[in-house]
A protein has these predicted regions:
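Sec/Tat signal peptide C-region and signal peptidase I cleavage site
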Residues: 18-22
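Extended, low-complexity, turn-rich repeat/linker tracts enriched in Gly/Pro/Ser/Thr and Asp/Glu
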Residues: 79-88, 142
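Bacterial N-terminal signal peptides
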Residues: 10-16
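Bacterial N-terminal signal peptides that target proteins for export
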Residues: 1-8, 172
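Short, charged juxtamembrane terminal tails flanking transmembrane helices
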Residues: 191-194
């Protein structure tokens, strides 16, 4: 019975520690005429064809990994493009490599308007040990301007690491539970010793 209590306390501690690391990771950029261009894909899971509208869109690429297998959210939160629909973003997530000359190769999922308004959102399962690339672009050619977005953990307790560096500090609410978990572990050990 004591071993079961110790195991339960250790499991609780593990869950609390993982939850403490699952913080949103913001990103921000700006699409400009001087950026590289490519023929983006159509939306899909996975995308199956190239766009006939977004044939020469500027893009930014965010390389990232995850620290635990789980479900992760990638989304644009705002955009202020100076032509076309002001917030019409388009995102694609790739695994292993992104090659703008072969935009369908390694494309896992692409989204146009699943976020609010014309913003983009992808939620998908990702695994540790894989390099991923989020490509942020516009729906139409020659749409330039700033945008913001974020990565977030949905399930799994892992953290998104953008460009090889942790993106955010642990959540304060989860860290406040850590002393409670440690106290429970100490109490179970004290009872088992008696």
């Amino acid at each position: 019975m004591n071993a079961l209590r110790t195991f339960a306390a250790a499991s609780l501690l593990s869950v609390v520690a993982q939850a403490a690391l699952a913080a949103p990771v913001p990103f921000a950029g700006s699409l400009a005429a001087a950026d590289p261009i490519y023929n983006r894909t159509l939306a899909g899971n996975p995308p199956g064809a190239l766009s006939a509208v977004g044939t020469a869109v500027s893009y930014d690429v965010y390389g990232f990994t995850v620290t635990a297998n789980g479900s992760y959210l990638m989304e644009t939160l705002s955009a202020a493009f100076i032509s076309g629909t002001a917030d019409d973003t388009f995102i694609t997530v790739y695994q292993n490599i992104f090659n703008p000359l072969a935009p369908l190769t390694n494309a896992l999922q692409a989204d146009d308007d699943n976020g609010p308004g014309a913003l983009s959102t992808i939620t998908r399962s990702l695994n540790t040990g894989v390099n991923y690339f989020l490509v942020v672009t516009s729906f139409d050619n020659r749409q330039f301007g700033p945008y913001t977005g974020r990565f977030d953990t949905v399930t799994g307790g892992g953290q998104v690491i953008v460009g090889g560096a942790p993106g955010a500090l642990p959540e304060p609410s989860a860290l406040m539970l850590l002393p409670l978990a440690l106290a429970g572990l100490a109490l179970s050990r004290k009872r088992s010793a008696a």
